[in-house]
Each structure stands twice: as C-alpha cells, then as structure tokens.
A protein has these predicted regions:
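Divalent metal-coordination and catalytic microenvironments
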Residues: 12, 31, 47, 58, ...
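Active-site core of metal-dependent hydrolases
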Residues: 157-251, 271-273, 294-296
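Divalent-metal coordination cores built from histidine and acidic residues
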Residues: 68-178, 221-234
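C-terminal cap of metal-dependent C-N hydrolases
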Residues: 12, 324-360
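Histidine-rich, glycine-flanked metal-binding segment
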Residues: 1-7, 13-51
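His/Asp/Glu-enriched, well-ordered alpha-helical/loop segment
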Residues: 250-333
Length: 360
C-alpha cells in the first residue's frame, strides 16, 4: 500500500451510486473524495469506470489477510454476519488501508441447533426462550456490535428458535437502536423471520420458491434482503441430493425484486472447516453480481445492490457513492459494468479510505 496523497483520476467514467456519469476528473484527497486537483498526482483512466468501493453485506472473517483479499478484489466494506470471540473481531476493526469490517458478534440461536455445535460458540448466544433475549442483546450491545444476527429455522423444527423468541430478540434490539438480520435458508424460516419484524433476511430458500405473496409482504413491511446467491448455488451443488435446488433461490430473488424489496449483495464468504460450501472472499462478490443479473436485476440494480443500498440500509452515510466529502473507498475497473456486469472483476486499482492498494 502507498501513503495517502492527493490523486486526480482523469477521463474516468463514474458510477456514482445511482447513474453512470460522463468522463470527468475525481480527486482523492487523503481519506476523502475531494474537489481540487491542483498539485495532485494525475492518473489517466481513459476507458475505465470508477465505482464506489463494493460492499459485501454477508461475510465471515477470521484474520487480517482475509480483509486484504477482499480489498484486492474491490470490496472495501464487509459485514461479518456471525463471528467470535469479540476480541478477535475488535482487532480487525479500523485497520488502515484495507477493508473496513462491521460485525454482529455471536448470533442468537437455539440450544440443539447446528450453531450450538460449532467450536467455542458463545454460551450467551443460546436462547432457550424469549426471556433470554434481553440479556443476549444487552451483551451484544456492550460488545459494540453494529447489528444483531438471528438464526431463523423452520418453525417447530429441532434446534429452531420459537416465534416468540425471534420476536423478543427483535424487540430488544430495536430498544437499543440495533438493526436485526435473520439467517433463513428455507421458505418457512424466511416467513417466520419476516413475521418477527427483522430488518433484513439473509439467504433465500433452496427448498421452495418464495410465494409472490411473501415477497409482497416483505416489501410492504419495508424489509430488505441479502440473498447470498453465490453460497446458495454452492450449497445446492454440494447437497442437491437432499432436495436443495438453486432454481428456488434464483426464482425467489426474482420474486423479491419484482415486489420491490431492496436487494443487497452478500456472499456468505467463508473458509470455516466443515462448512457445507467454501465460498472465496473477494471473487465471490463479482460472481454474486452476475448471479443477481441472471436472476432478473439489471446491471444498474446490481451495482446499487453492492454500493448505495447496503450503505443506506446499514446507516453507512460516509460511503456507498462517489461524491465530494465521502470516504475515498473506490474501485477502478476496466470496461463498463453497466453494459457488462462482469467488468467489475477487472479491477485496475482500489482505494480504501484514500489508501491505494499496491501490486494489483
């Protein structure tokens, strides 16, 4: 990485988070996007497109090297959706010149759940009933989490949180001003999470397509979705013999999009031992964008799903767009991703908080 100095990117097309602008000059002035090119190092970006730094709204990160891999692929902000211990996640926050990490800490899960058998899973994350929700949320708030993760499974299934417990976690989080994100990879679990009032559901069903009525309710109740199609595709390939079908996930995204539910990019990238599918950090975000377009989003929709929408829905007011005064999280790609979404993977340069990644 090189030290932050003023840089003027000239003749560059700019996707500002909402639209593609004609070639112009964008100034990187320290950690922010500036306006004055005087004295700046000039980089001619003819033929390239400048994007806001990409946001992966569902990852699992265990070390700084993983953040660097994300950054090298243009992912400048990542949202960890379940990690522990707190000291590890704290050590990965606010590292200069690499991907910025937000985190949920340990998710709320039921005794007997798959999560309960994970190594060193936090005891405080195991909720026997709604009476355990306030203490769980209080502990996460004390740890400084950015949002609360909840595991929603098919109601009544072994190892599933009850509907009352889901609702109690949402209430307790809302009282503390924390957003809630529910894991739900089955159609009935998705509906249970939506009824509980979560802000977002991550994953889409592999067991059945979401009905249009469920998608419409999700939109009417102002929920948003993080489908993680890259992971759903990989899981279906690994466990298709169990009746899991990627076409259900793809059709569910199409239904949510038609209903007007905001769609955010998230990959569930992880390298955890024993995971049903290993999804690589960085490249999977570009694959996710292509899968979203395949599911019916336009390239413009997909780019917004990776930039302005996650910034908006997670309250990240300093990023997600290209405008003076915002954080200089930027990615320069060859080509025009509005014409060909796969252009996002042709990364020429990346800036994280104004610090340029070297060696790309």
């Amino acid at each position: 990485m090189t030290a932050s100095t003023a840089t003027a990117l000239t003749h560059v097309r700019v996707f500002d988070g909402e639209r593609l602008r004609e070639p112009e000059t964008v100034v990187i002035d320290g950690p922010l996007i500036g306006t004055d090119p005087a004295g700046a190092r000039v980089v001619d970006c003819q033929g390239a497109t400048l994007l806001p730094g990409l946001i992966d709204a569902h990852v699992h990160v265990r070390d700084a090297a993983t953040l660097d891999r994300l950054a090298d692929h243009g992912v400048t902000t990542a949202l960890d959706m379940g990690g522990w211990p707190p000291a590890l996640l704290d050590s990965l926050r606010d590292l200069p010149g690499t991907t910025a990490l937000l985190r949920a800490g340990g998710p709320a899960a039921a005794p007997g759940s798959v999560q309960s058998r994970m190594p060193h899973f936090p005891e405080s994350s195991l909720l026997a009933g709604p009476e355990d929700a306030p203490a769980f949320v209080a502990e996460r708030a004390e740890q400084g989490v950015d949002y609360v993760k909840i595991i929603a499974e098919v109601p009544g299934a072994p190892g599933a949180l009850s509907q009352e417990t889901l609702e109690a976690v949402v209430r307790a989080a809302r009282e503390r001003g924390l957003r809630t994100v529910a894991h739900a990879s089955a159609a009935a679990a998705f509906a249970a999470a939506r009824r509980a009032g979560v802000d977002a559901v991550t994953h889409v069903p592999l067991d059945a397509q979401l009905p249009a009525t469920e998608a419409e309710l999700t939109a009417a109740e102002s929920r948003f979705a993080i489908p993680t199609l890259a992971t759903m595709e990989a899981v279906a390939q690994a466990l298709g013999h169990l009746g899991l079908d990627y076409t259900h996930a793809r059709a569910s995204v199409a239904a949510l999009h038609r209903a007007g539910v905001p769609i955010l990019t998230g990959t569930d990238a992880n390298n955890a031992p024993g995971a049903p599918a290993s999804v690589p950090h960085g490249p999977s975000l570009h694959h996710e964008l292509a899968l979203l377009v395949d599911a019916g989003l336009t390239p413009l929709d997909a780019l917004r799903a990776a930039t302005v929408l996650p910034a908006r829905h997670f309250g990240l007011t300093d990023r997600g767009a290209v405008a003076p005064g915002l954080r200089a999280d930027l990615v320069l790609v060859d080509g025009d991703p509005l014409a060909d979404i796969t252009a996002t993977a042709r990364v020429r340069a990346v800036w994280c908080g104004g610090v340029e990644r070297a060696g790309l």
